[in-house]
Amino acid sequence: MPPEIVVVGAGAAGIIASWRAAQLGAKVLLLEKNPRIGTKILVSGGGKCNITHDGELEDLLRAFRPAEARFIRPACYRFTNREIVKMLTSRGLEVYTRPDGRIFPVHQTAKDVVAILGSYLAEAGVEVRLSTPVKRIAHEGGHVVGVEVADGLISCPRV
């Protein structure tokens, strides 16, 4: 059975989007061009992984340009910075908050964060294909019909 949703990119946003869609019952395929998920997470905060910030959401949004803040505001209110921390700590990650409000893993390794996010994907039944760059998003009649990868077209109605 083909996926209902294909998510392109297994960075933080792609991982969370895939996991949440699968939680809501969708058959999800997550495509990543790199040989592992979370490549950008692994280098965030100098490899220590600045998970999020402890501030209020509106304070966080002020750090973005106005157009960016308008774009991400709805997603930030649907899945808050505090929920991200709870998601990780509920799986055993210990975190601490620096005086500037940035939240990091106690053991200062992004690998732990990526491993926990990977466990959420597996638990939700998300299919992950690594080393699979997307060539293009395929359209017919103004509608998405799939994504093209090296092996051919993966049919799906949502990307």
Language-model region placement:
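Conserved N-terminal/central alpha/beta ligand/cofactor-binding core
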Residues: 33-127
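Short coil/turn connectors at secondary-structure junctions
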Residues: 2-3, 24-26, 37-38, 46, ...
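Predominantly flavin-linked oxidoreductase catalytic cores and closely associated redox partners
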Residues: 43, 110-159
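Anionic group-transfer/hydrolysis microenvironments
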Residues: 6, 34, 133
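Short glycine-rich loop/turn motifs that provide flexible caps or phosphate-binding loops at active sites
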Residues: 8-13, 37, 44-46, 145
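Hydrophobic/aromatic ligand-binding patch that stacks against planar heteroaromatic rings
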Residues: 16, 20-21, 33, 40-41, ...
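Hydrophobic anchor at the start of a short beta-strand
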Residues: 26-29, 95, 159
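N-terminal Rossmann-like FAD-binding beta1-loop-alpha1 element of flavoenzymes
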Residues: 3-30
